[in-house]
Amino acid sequence: MKYSSEFRDKTIAQGLARAIDAEVSSQRAYRFVEFCGGHTHAISRYGLEDLLPANVRMIHGPGCPVCVLPASRIDMAIRLAERPEVILCVYGDLMRAPGSQGQSLLLAKALGAHIRMVYSTLDAIRLAEQTPGREVVFFAIGFETTTPPTAVMIRIAEHKRLEGLSVFCNHVLTPSAMHRILENPKIRNTGGVPIDGFIGPAHVSTIVGTQPYEPMAEQFEKPIVVAGFEPLDVLQAVLMLVRQVNQNRHEVENQYSRAVTREGNRRAKEEVSQVFELREQFEWRGLGLVPNSGLKLKQSYAKFDAETRFAIHDLRVADNPACECCAILRGAKRPIDCKLFGNICTPETPIGACMVSSEGACAAYWTYRRVRDEQARQTS
């Protein structure tokens, strides 16, 4: 089994769609949040919403690390990169993420800031070795999936005594964000619509396992199904959620058992726990300040913390009021509800983070809905 084409089988997908249609009750609505941006793209790419009954609604969640990074953190990174001694190492999908007042790392680079696009933490290590007289700062971002490589990088830097390497840490935690959505009525009732369940993230769950979701499912009485990214994965997860709702169950189920266990990746979690600890709170675009949702370096590794080394402090900046990215990340609105979408906000000229990132909901709508519209025009 190749674990790809088999999970895109059209006949099986149609069978799952019929099963969902047979199980849903016409007397109620079903509203499920797909937390991960990868699921949002799968739903858009394969047109899965078109296969679901009208009373089953998929709500896009804040599962895109570039999208949820607030503009203030981009501004802080730009200030770092403008220092003459600093070389800022950045993953490519961050380069166009919007800061305040139209700023971005790409624009800052064009204006002379020392910014290098990297593909892995190893690139930052090599650069620090090659430029001993400079301060190499790695812009660490992402959920639990990308945190272990950052932890390993810091331990390598300590072992090699790379005094010129530091980390601007923006790693965030998925369970904390899910908890925030469920505990906050203004967020939980997305646009006045309650949430009935979650499709849990795939890649994140390979690291953390399914156990962290269990207290939430019990406390808030909401079913959670961890699912893979293929179309059959998503459809099966929806079917599992529908059955739980119908049976008044609120359990954590693992549809993605071919990659996810209850315990997760113990070695990866150990690497992270050696280097990082919880922040008291961290700001998320769309969710505000979320308690215990971000990571920082432990005191024993504080010498590698760029925020400490360069004495940079949190900023508070307002988002573009015309952009609905914050509401989209909360699930209160969809990309097509934003008046900028497809007009002045496109992948070529993005205004909001949801259009910049390859995992953003706006990027998914733009890419796949345009493709389907074009296909429809060609066949009409």
Swiss-Prot record:
Keywords linked to the UniProt accession: 4Fe-4S, Iron, Iron-sulfur, Metal-binding
GO biological process: what's one of them?
A: protein maturation
Q: Quick check: keyword Nucleotide-binding in the entry?
A: no
**Entry-linked InterPro entries:** Hyd_form_HypD, HypD_1, HypD_2_sf
| Entries under Pfam families matching the protein | HypD (PF01924)
The GO molecular function terms of this record are: 4 iron, 4 sulfur cluster binding; carbon monoxide binding; iron ion binding
Pathway participation: Protein modification; [NiFe] hydrogenase maturation
Residue ranges the record marks as coiled coil: none
Cofactor(s) essential for the protein: [4Fe-4S] cluster
Q: Cite the binding residues for Fe cation.
A: 36, 64, 67
What is the role of this chain?
A: Involved in the maturation of [NiFe] hydrogenases. Involved in the biosynthesis of the Fe(CN)(2)CO cofactor.
Q: Which family does it belong to?
A: Belongs to the HypD family.
Q: What is this protein called?
A: Hydrogenase maturation factor HypD1
